[in-house]
Each structure stands twice: as structure tokens, then as C-alpha cells.
Amino acid sequence: MKVAVLQFPGTNCEFDAKYAFTKLGCDVEVIWHKDTKLPENTDLVVVPGGFSYGDYLRSGAIARFANIMEDVKKFATNGGKVLGICNGFQILLEVVLLLGAMKRNDTLHFISKYHTLKVIDNNNDFLRLLNIGDVVNIPVAHHDGNYYIDEVGLKELEANNQ
């Protein structure tokens, strides 16, 4: 599997992602935000966490204008798989590859803790080795982690098993 991991000024997890996918046997290339094309035969694009461009305006707001994002949008629109981790998820929201938006945490404080999730669907490449009903603990760390989507958007996600 060929994995392209994006790198923006301020991201800090691109080499963690490269390490993890390399350990899984993937061919991984880190792609600088000013590049305009993903590597040929890319199977997966990973948009990593951190604080792209310092998150000065809004998390991911500036990164959405990076040169590479046009090719990422084209890749995703043509059925390519894209994984957004932390700030990467926020970037995907800003570039409108995902529905919804991120808001500040209700507490208005930075949150860093483990969160328990229950697997309700494993019909995808990321969860296929887990069983429905499995419980996993994942670390979360964010200031803008309050995902919001309107009712129409939520119904669309549910209809697409997303």
C-alpha cells in the first residue's frame, strides 16, 4: 500500500504516522504542503495532527489553501481514501471533504484524555480487524474538538454508513 502523509508548517505528527504505516509494511512518503501532486499510485492520504500554520485563524483554516489540497480533493472525489487525524480532520472539514464543522470545546479549555469508543460498524479498511461491540480507548487532545453537524448532514452521513 502506498501512503502519502502530508506535512504543513506546524504539524507535528507526520513522522509518527510515517513510522506507524511503515511498521505495517506500507510504502510511505511525506509530502510537503507546497507540492501540487500526490505520488503516483497513492492508495491512502494521511492528513496529520498538530497545529497547521499555528491554527491562528481557526484550526485548519489556512491549510485548506495549501497547494497539495487541490490534488487531495481530486483524489478523494475519485474515491481515494483520506484519513484526517486531529488537526488533519479539522483541515478536511475546512476543505469541505467532510460535512460539519469544529467548534471550541464546551468548557473553553484544552482537553487531553482517553476516550472510550464502541465499534458499531467495521465495514471499512480502518476497523475491519475489530469486531462490532469491541471497545477501544483512544487518546484525544484538542481545544477545538466539539464536532457539529446539522440534522440534514447527519442524515446524509448515516445514509452513507459514515
PLM features: residue spans?
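N-terminal beta1-alpha1 cap of cysteine-dependent amidohydrolase-like domains
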Residues: 1-84, 92-99, 103-111, 118, ...
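Residues that flank catalytic or metal-binding motifs in active/ligand-binding sites
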Residues: 87, 113, 134-135
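Short, flexible active-site-adjacent loop segments at beta-strand->alpha-helix junctions, enriched
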Residues: 88-89, 123
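Short hydrophobic/aromatic residue motifs in ordered secondary structure
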Residues: 89-90, 145
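Short loop segments at secondary-structure junctions
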Residues: 96, 120-123, 143
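Conserved catalytic micro-motifs used in adenylation/nucleotidyl-transfer and phosphoryl/amide-
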Residues: 116-128
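C-terminal and late-domain segments of enzyme folds
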Residues: 127-162
